[in-house]
Amino acid sequence: IIGGSSKYFKFKENIFHKLYEEILFLSNKYMINVIPSRRTPLAFIERLKKMDLKNIYIFEDQFNPVEYGNLLSEAEVQIVTWDSISMISEAISSGAKTLIFPFEENSCPKRYKNFYDRIIEENFISIYNRNLQAPTPDLNKYNSELKSKILNKIESNLSFKLNES
């Protein structure tokens, strides 16, 4: 999943060059689904199309949530540029191994770094590596813990409300 320029990240040409190199490298061994975001420059997508590689599928309909969801759910591994917490969260929620592709580290906001540190610590993701080594997230455990927290919060608010009356 490839993002694009934002308030924090400029996505300069050297970043796209690195992405091309990695896509080319991985396509020699794996089928690659390239999912650009609405912020991904058209020139990058067009350049990928011109490469005409047999193991690359470029998802072009960003307004088709069904196909987007299918691509996420069918993949064994997700590689996501780290410029969007939402894209990373969607990749993790697919249950596949997720790797984030860092760049422009100096312009990365502290809250983003805190998010990355937390999800790495929780074994949800790894930093991109060519071996595609990453943990498989245990979403059942996470969802169970989240459910307990939500129910406890609701319960504590209910008892507070009942005591007020």
Language-model segments: residues:
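Catalytic binding pocket for nucleotide-activated donors in carbohydrate/polymer assembly enzymes
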Residues: 86-136
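Short, well-ordered alpha-helix to beta-strand connector turns
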Residues: 29-30, 75, 95
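Active-site donor-nucleotide binding/catalytic segment of nucleotide-sugar enzymes
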Residues: 1-42
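Short, structured helix-loop element that forms part of the nucleotide-activated donor/catalytic region
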Residues: 39-52
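Donor nucleotide-activated moiety binding/catalytic core segment of transferases
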Residues: 49-86
